Amino acid sequence: MAALVVLADERGYQSLRVEDLIALAGVARGAFYEQFRGRDDLLLATVTEIGELGLRDAATAYKRGGPAEVRLRAAIEGVIGFAVAQTAAARLWLVDAYGAGPAAIDTAEQGLDGIRALVAQALAELAGEATPDEAPALDGTDAAALSPDAIRALTGAVHRLIASRLRRRHEDELPSLGRPLAAWIASYRPPPTPLRRPRGHATPGTDARIAPRDQAERILLGVCDAIYDKGYTATTLADVAARASTSIRTFYAHYESKEEAFVDAVDLAQVQSYAAVLAASRRAPDWPQAVRAGLTALCNYFAGEPPLAEAVVVEVHAAGEQALRRHEESTAAIGRLLEPGYELAPDTPAIAAEAIGSAIDTLLYDAIRAGGGPKVRAIAPTATYLALFPFIGSTAACEVANDTGQPRRRG
């Protein structure tokens, strides 16, 4: 396990061979296969152990006592402290595992599940719905609490902000994240009335398959279709050519590699989704309604194109640094939609815009992994509520998310 952590940190997980691991660990090939079925099996075992250690640090800090907000901050700082002290291990858990296929993702998520429970407990106490000895329901049966999707989104924001710094080797930025992230999460309260599922269907045309304008876009959509079928790592140029109804020769006339074409596919999704967001938000009568319209348009865009959504939101984590940078630019664009909110609530933590963008990315990611389509459209009210709450409060954010009443300034 130690050899995997070291080599993955040096070379990246996808480039590792069992022979490399055996050589560094100093064990016989037979001894390795007595313990593990292969490299991926070793990854699952290693990520499980790392996740348990990260959760242990968070839970230990949380249980030291104090008010709920103090314990929440301690838990988040515990996870961050683990990432600072065990950078290579944390990178394998919070970054590399998410590009190594569904089993690795599910294993990495198990470590985060315990942290989600701590966040849910603290927020339930802050909302007056639980005591320190009561565990909140995480299945959505507690109508007075934040929904499980909202809890996953808030915790997912913590994960993504840590993972981004780890991936870019900016570990020095991690210690300063704990206090503002905890303050941002601790501010949330449940909506006064349940958030509604979106009414009716998407705007006509939003579920239509994107029509490629030229051969290059046909190839990009073929890339997404092939990745949707097989996953990024397993997809070959022959798969892309078949799904794009073209030849490998034609592919090379436009792109040098699968990696280059995929980055362009991420760019295509970014441009088209942001255009949909802007078009919808500009028609809104005020800023809160613009946020709701924009996020609804974003959800409708990805709901209408499942292969592209799977590729550029989920499989992007397997596609390398350049593609991930482009994806983070898309997430940052959501944050820019929130900038007017700081005029309404100037005391909102500066990190809120980045964190909310990451929370919404988590909602999209989870909904797409769960099947996409209508599940993606269904997250729009939760995304709207999470985006608006820090700036206009629970009542107004709920009214806007449910498309009822008039938004009010936070008082």
What are these regions (language model features)?
Residues A59-A88, E134-A143, L278-P307:
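Hydrophobic alpha-helical connector segments
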Residues A8, F36, D41-L53, W93, ...:
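Alpha-helical DNA-contacting segments of helix-turn-helix folds
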Residues P102-L138, A145-R160, S176-A183, G320-T362, ...:
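Amphipathic alpha-helical packing segments from all-alpha helical-bundle domains
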Residues L7-D41, A226-E260:
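Helix-turn-helix
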Residues V84, S164-R167, E217-G231, A238-A241, ...:
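Long compositionally biased, domain-poor regions of proteins
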Residues G81, A117, Q121, E125-G128, ...:
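C-terminal peripheral helix-coil segments that are non-catalytic and often amphipathic
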Residues L4, L16, G54-L55, A89-W93, ...:
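Short, structured motif recognition centered on aromatic/hydrophobic residues
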Residues M1-L4, L21, T46-I50, G54, ...:
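Generic hydrophobic, amphipathic alpha-helix propensity
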